[in-house]
């Protein structure tokens, strides 16, 4: 069971706890462009969830998520928290752009800062508040080498990689990018016509991707607008994926399909992506606070 705190205070986030277990912890339920995010504050020495606990949290009523952002004490000077990112199958992710914006909102409202830095497995991430519910996140530089994605074998050009799959529609090669997570982007004429639930999971586990991959299908509508649908590694079909939006813009620009800045249309909303001349990728988009919930003991009664 979870207890819903229906009426958050003007400061709608709990103060950092100190010690104890996950039971009784308050969780901020948020979304970034439709991406379902939980922000769990474990600063003060509380142990991180195990993979089984991560799955159990997702199965609990009111706590289902695409990504769980677990905040721990900072490990590097100048940062406010170390963020461990869980997919809803209990696996870990290196980056989550939409979730990072939600974390930035949580910490900005806590500290009053408009600019802040957090740390993830992918490195330091600078965040900036642009408006009451709008944030820009520096997603860093894309990694483009075949061994950085990683792929199972060397390829001559990561802009165009054949990913053969029996029975799959003729959609051409993928462009592969690592934006903290491995991504494969297929550019198609009609993104709405792709059977995402059928082909997404099959491409995700293709032998070419030893760490699996996030699979995106993108339709370029103009030099500055792309429609996108995403099958997220360890999650499934989602309404939005920030790192996939970044990977898609980088891929489109490398192929000469767009400029280095574009609006990415996702089922849950829009994100603005800019690939700067110094190679950094900036993502700008909305966040929404939904409610707080409390993790109760029976959430973990049958975790596995």
What are these regions (language model features)?
Residues 140:
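Segments forming oxygen-rich coordination pockets for charged ligands
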Residues 2-7, 20-133, 184-304:
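A glycine-rich beta-to-alpha transition motif near the start of alpha/beta enzyme domains, typified by
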Residues 143-145:
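Ligand-binding beta-strand-loop-alpha-helix segment within the catalytic cores
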Residues 11-13:
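Low-complexity, intrinsically disordered or signal/transmembrane-proximal segments
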Residues 152-162, 201-209:
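Short, conserved active-site entrance elements at the starts or edges of catalytic domains
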Residues 135-137:
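Intrinsically disordered, low-complexity regions enriched in acidic/Ser/Thr/Pro/Gln residues
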Residues 159-193:
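Internal active-site segments that recognize and position negatively charged phosphoryl groups
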């Amino acid at each position: 069971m979870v207890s819903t705190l229906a009426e958050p205070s003007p400061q709608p986030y709990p103060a950092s706890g100190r010690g104890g277990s996950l039971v009784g912890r308050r969780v901020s339920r948020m979304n970034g462009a439709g991406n379902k995010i939980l922000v769990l504050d474990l600063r003060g020495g509380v142990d991180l969830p195990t993979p089984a606990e991560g799955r159990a949290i997702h199965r609990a009523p009111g706590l289902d998520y695409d990504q769980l952002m677990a905040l721990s004490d900072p490990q590097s000077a100048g940062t406010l928290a170390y963020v461990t990112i869980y997919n809803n199958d209990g696996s870990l992710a290196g980056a989550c752009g939409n979730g990072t914006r939600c974390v930035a909102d949580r910490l900005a409202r806590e500290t009053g800062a408009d600019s802040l830095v957090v740390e993830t497995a992918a490195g330091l991430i600078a965040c900036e508040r642009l408006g009451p519910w709008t944030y820009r996140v520096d997603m860093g530089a894309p990694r483009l080498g075949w061994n950085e994605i990683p792929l199972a074998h060397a390829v001559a050009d990561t802009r165009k990689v054949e990913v053969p799959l029996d029975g799959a529609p003729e959609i051409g090669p993928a462009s592969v990018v690592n934006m903290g997570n491995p991504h494969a982007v297929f550019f198609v004429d009609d993104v709405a016509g792709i059977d995402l639930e059928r082909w997404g999971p099959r491409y995700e586990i293709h032998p070419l991707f030893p760490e699996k991959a996030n699979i995106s299908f993108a339709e370029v509508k103009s030099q500055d607008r792309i429609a996108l649908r995403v099958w997220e590694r360890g999650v499934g079909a989602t309404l939005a994926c920030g790192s996939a939006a970044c990977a898609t813009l980088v891929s489109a620009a490398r192929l000469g399909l767009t400029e280095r800045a574009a609006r990415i249309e996702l089922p849950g909303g829009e994100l603005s992506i800019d690939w700067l001349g110094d190679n950094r990728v900036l993502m700008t988009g909305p966040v929404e606070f939904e409610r707080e919930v409390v993790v109760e003991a029976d959430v973990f009664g049958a975790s596995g």
